[in-house]
């Protein structure tokens, strides 16, 4: 086998590989001989078909199979010979496949970058702490009450938290636009499910009233023709409903799995869940800071093929979420056309870069999966189910799930390593701040 390696641009490599014709011819002859023992052709007994007939009937197909196998095998042999680490699948371009002549093909592919992780000591991280107070528990219980509340019509002006039934018609430059009209739409004021300014304009209206609300569409609105555009909505309120909160009694507690122990047990369960949520959120904030620090401190050449694969994974994830949310309405949608690559490119590049950096740290520091940490992570998940032991057994019996937990454990171990070298300061925040997503905090 002859191999020629060329570095084209950046991480791209081009391998020209030659395979002796004899290697292919011998394998074709071997497979045809094996096939002759079992093929059935009219006019011949099984195993007695002449090789010339077998060659005529099956030779071309067998040769194609052998060529495919030989090219695939010789590519990876060449990669090992040149000590390369391909990232993604190669693009194979056959140059010479004629029978009787040496085979030649060109494989174009990317390799993993050489990474030297540095700057861990310069990473600055704030380790947040928070306490779940009695007031936090009261607020959470009120939220749970609202989730089970009944709605009753009111004659007063609408306020935040009310549910309204509205008709509206939107215009831009005096012209109606697609999707800007609806009748009998239910909306909870303060849910932020409409564009900014729309719900605020309805607050203070009574049933039967009509108002014109002026709004400006966000610059990142999904419909390109409306991005940043000013519009007017003529809104008529059909109905205003206020919430009627349920009493804190055994019937209410039972809806959340508390069948004995009354309010004391209910409050204890709520606090326990809040503590769990708080710890998860604080761990997430810490990890995010560490990962941001790693990306900022290390510039990495990113293989385009890995980014492309990550984009596809992110798009599929969002597509699955849309399928779950919209059901049959989302069937047949070409997600690639409505969810373009640019939507996910930045996130995909970051994820690939982080994956490469974390993998390099694991390799350099010789970090192996902490089995006790894996066990702890699985037990944390299992504790939220009615039969924890069944969940634990299920995880350990599912190779894919277990692999995901082991990957998460490795990430936690890397975070711990970085924290041991980084500049860490402590800060106490409220429970509300602790559980609030980072993106939402940034907006505020």
Swiss-Prot record:
Residues 161-246 form the PPIase FKBP-type domain. It is an enzyme of class 5 (isomerase). Keywords: Cell cycle, Cell division, Chaperone, Cytoplasm, Isomerase, Rotamase. InterPro entries: PPIase_dom_sf, PPIase_FKBP_dom, Trig_fac, Trigger_fac_C, Trigger_fac_C_sf, Trigger_fac_ribosome-bd_bac, Trigger_fac_ribosome-bd_sf, Trigger_fact/SurA_dom_sf. It catalyses: [protein]-peptidylproline (omega=180) = [protein]-peptidylproline (omega=0). Pfam families: FKBP_C, Trigger_C, Trigger_N. It is found in: Cytoplasm. Its EC number is 5.2.1.8. Its main location: cytoplasm. GO terms for cellular component: cytoplasm. GO terms for molecular function: peptidyl-prolyl cis-trans isomerase activity; protein folding chaperone; ribosome binding. GO terms for biological process: 'de novo' cotranslational protein folding; cell division; chaperone-mediated protein folding; protein transport; protein unfolding. Belongs to the FKBP-type PPIase family. Tig subfamily. Involved in protein export. Acts as a chaperone by maintaining the newly synthesized protein in an open conformation. Functions as a peptidyl-prolyl cis-trans isomerase. PANTHER family: TRIGGER FACTOR CHAPERONE AND PEPTIDYL-PROLYL CIS/TRANS ISOMERASE (PTHR30560), TRIGGER FACTOR-LIKE PROTEIN TIG, CHLOROPLASTIC (PTHR30560:SF3). Consists of 3 domains; the N-terminus binds the ribosome, the middle domain has PPIase activity, while the C-terminus has intrinsic chaperone activity on its own. This is Trigger factor.
């Amino acid at each position: 086998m002859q191999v020629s390696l060329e570095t084209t641009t950046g991480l791209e490599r081009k391998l020209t590989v030659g395979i002796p014709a004899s290697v292919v011819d011998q394998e074709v002859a071997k497979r045809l001989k094996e096939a002759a023992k079992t093929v059935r052709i009219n006019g011949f007994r099984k195993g007695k078909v002449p090789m010339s007939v077998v060659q005529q009937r099956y030779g071309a197909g067998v040769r194609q199979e052998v060529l495919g196998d030989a090219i695939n095998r010789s590519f990876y042999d060449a990669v090992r010979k040149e000590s390369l680490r391909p990232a993604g699948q190669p693009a194979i371009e056959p140059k010479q496949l004629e029978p009787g002549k040496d085979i030649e093909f060109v494989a174009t592919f990317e390799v993993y970058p050489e990474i030297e992780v540095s700057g861990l000591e310069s990473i600055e991280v704030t380790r947040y702490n928070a306490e779940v107070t009695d007031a936090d528990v009261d607020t959470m219980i009120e939220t749970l009450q609202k989730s089970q509340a009944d709605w009753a019509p009111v004659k007063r002006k609408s306020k935040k938290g009310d549910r309204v039934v509205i008709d509206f018609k939107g215009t831009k430059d005096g012209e109606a636009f697609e999707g800007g009209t609806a009748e009998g739409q239910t909306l909870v004021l303060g849910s932020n499910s409409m564009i900014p300014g729309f719900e605020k304009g309805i607050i203070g209206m009574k049933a039967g009233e009509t108002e014109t609300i002026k709004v400006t569409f966000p610059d990142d609105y999904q419909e390109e023709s409306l991005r940043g555009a000013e519009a007017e909505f003529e809104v008529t309120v059909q109905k205003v409903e206020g919430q009627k909160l349920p009493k804190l009694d055994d019937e209410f507690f039972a809806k959340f799995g508390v069948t004995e122990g009354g309010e004391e047990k209910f409050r204890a369960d709520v606090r326990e869940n809040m503590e769990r949520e708080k710890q998860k959120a604080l761990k997430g904030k810490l990890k995010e800071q560490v990962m941001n620090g790693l990306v900022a401190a290390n510039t990495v050449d990113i293989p385009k093929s890995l980014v492309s694969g990550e984009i596809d994974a992110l798009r599929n994830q969002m597509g699955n979420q849309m399928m779950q949310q919209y059901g049959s309405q989302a069937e047949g949608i070409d997600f690639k056309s409505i969810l373009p690559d640019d939507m996910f490119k930045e996130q995909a590049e970051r994820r690939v870069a982080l994956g490469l950096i974390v993998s390099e740290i694991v390799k350099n520091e010789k970090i192996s999966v902490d089995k006790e940490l894996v066990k702890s992570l699985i037990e944390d998940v299992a504790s939220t189910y009615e039969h924890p032991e069944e969940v634990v057994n299920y995880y350990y019996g599912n190779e894919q799930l277990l692999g995901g937990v082991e990957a998460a454990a490795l990430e936690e171990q890397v975070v711990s390593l970085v924290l041991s070298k980084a500049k860490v300061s402590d800060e106490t925040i409220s429970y509300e701040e602790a559980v609030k997503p980072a993106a939402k905090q940034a907006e505020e």
